[in-house]
Amino acid sequence: MKAANASSAEAYRVLSRAFRFDNEDQKLWWHSTAPMFAKMLETANYTTPCQYQYLITYKECVIPSLGCYPTNSAPRWLSILTRYGTPFELSLNCSNSIVRYTFEPINQHTGTDKDPFNTHAIWESLQHLLPLEKSIDLEWFRHFKHDLTLNSEESAFLAHNDRLVGGTIRTQNKLALDLKDGRFALKTYIYPALKAVVTGKTIHELVFGSVRRLAVREPRILPPLNMLEEYIRSRGSKSTASPRLVSCDLTSPAKSRIKIYLLEQMVSLEAMEDLWTLGGRRRDASTLEGLSLVRELWDLIQLSPGLKSYPAPYLPLGVIPDERLPLMANFTLHQNDPVPEPQVYFTTFGMNDMAVADALTTFFERRGWSEMARTYETTLKSYYPHADHDKLNYLHAYISFSYRDRTPYLSVYLQSFETGDWAVANLSESKVKCQDAACQPTSLPPDLSKTGVYYSGLH
């Protein structure tokens, strides 16, 4: 039987025949990512009109904001979104079969004197998306953007004092779209690492200070904020967990949710249990039911335990990862609940992808998600049909898990670059000259020609 191939997805094939692109970079982005995107929508049983709508929106409103097409031979902006510095990632909520994607907007000024740390490109992307979704509200976005990202003067100062930045995360903001019922919900993710450098404040001080200022207008978020901060402080100065970023829904303040993300360097079941229960502060029946499923996932996935940290440099495209990364968790500050709601992340990047897929399939079967269990591995293979699947270890970046209203929610975050027939289509041999973005790198990739280490699908 012929193996499934994402490039055979009908919506991708039809639109590829119809589309014209403004430049070669946008064409390459489409053929690199759209096969997987189209296949994911198709397998998740989106209606045909919705498949076309979401793919057209992606082509018209998002691809122009992805910058030059990444290669190892040309400088580019390196995004924190993936270990390869690529600015786009698809994910799937397996519980509800909801497709999502995240991207870091990049434009022609990114990395130049006009915007050395990519502070402003996000506004251009928002202008493209605002007319398409009436529910978008930027009030909370403006608040966090002002408090947690660089202004023009701060950007100029750091650009002239680059030694202060060093290996600090340079990504400051990302956008994400949840695709449902022909519409999309827009979210933002804000990284205040550069703001911490220029202000001399810690990320903890910046994030919690900003949310507290917002609580003056929205006091209902104060109780869960206080509980979360008390938990973090109770772990002491030698804690292996620390705030990393904040996110919120770009909808009306009455409906929006704030999430504070913690990086947990200690990879262990005990550390994950501590995050899940907020050090024992959450002990209700629903929390304990969810905890049993966290333990089940831990046993199935088999993360490598120990103290982990993010390696400083990004991985050059094509290099097989040989690393294990820290855990992550976020805590939602609901306006009608004094207790923060946890979501934990199993960092599976660098693990054998077929073993991860087998673990997930078992979990799906136990939950009664029979269709997801039946199709998950086959669909995963279709995204990279020409790869040696038994050797892949870069597809699953994260697996997230939360539990609310006695219902489990699990999502997978997947490598979304050079998918489908890319490896055999010779598109990667095109001579790419970045036309729309300066794409200045945080560092230039090393010469890979001497390593001899590549994997099918990335070049």
Curated annotation (Swiss-Prot):
InterPro entries: Aro_prenylTrfase, Aro_prenylTrfase_DMATS, DMATS-type_fun, Trp_dimethylallylTrfase
Signal sequence, start to end: none
Disruption phenotype: Impairs the production of ergot alkaloids including festuclavine, fumigaclavine A, fumigaclavine B and fumigaclavine C.
Residues at which dimethylallyl diphosphate binds: R100, K187, Y189, R257, K259, Y261, Q343, Y345, Y409, Y413
The protein's enzyme class: transferase
Gene Ontology molecular function: prenyltransferase activity; tryptophan dimethylallyltransferase activity
Biotech applications: Ergot alkaloids are known for their toxic effects on humans who consume contaminated grains or livestock that graze on grasses harboring ergot alkaloid-producing fungi. Due to their strong affinity for monoamine neurotransmitter receptors they may also have clinical uses such as treatment of migraines, Parkinson's disease and cerebrovascular insufficiency.
EC annotation from Swiss-Prot or TrEMBL: 2.5.1.34
Keyword line: Alkaloid metabolism, Prenyltransferase, Transferase
GO biological process terms held by the UniProt record: fumigaclavine C biosynthetic process
One Pfam family cited in the UniProt record for this chain: Trp_DMAT
Source organism, top-level taxon: Eukaryota
Induction profile: The expression of the ergot alkaloid synthesis cluster which leads to the synthesis of fumigaclavines is positively regulated by the brlA and stuA transcription factors.
UniProt: L-tryptophan binding residues: I80, L81, E89, Y191, R244
Pathway entry: Alkaloid biosynthesis; ergot alkaloid biosynthesis
Reactions mediated catalytically: L-tryptophan + dimethylallyl diphosphate = 4-(3-methylbut-2-enyl)-L-tryptophan + diphosphate
Protein family (similarity comment): Belongs to the tryptophan dimethylallyltransferase family.
Subunit-structure text: Homodimer.
Task of the protein: Tryptophan dimethylallyltransferase; part of the gene cluster that mediates the biosynthesis of fumiclavanine C, a fungal ergot alkaloid. DmaW catalyzes the first step of ergot alkaloid biosynthesis by condensing dimethylallyl diphosphate (DMAP) and tryptophan to form 4-dimethylallyl-L-tryptophan. The second step is catalyzed by the methyltransferase easF that methylates 4-dimethylallyl-L-tryptophan in the presence of S-adenosyl-L-methionine, resulting in the formation of 4-dimethylallyl-L-abrine.
Protein name in UniProt: Tryptophan dimethylallyltransferase
Gene symbol of the encoding locus: dmaW
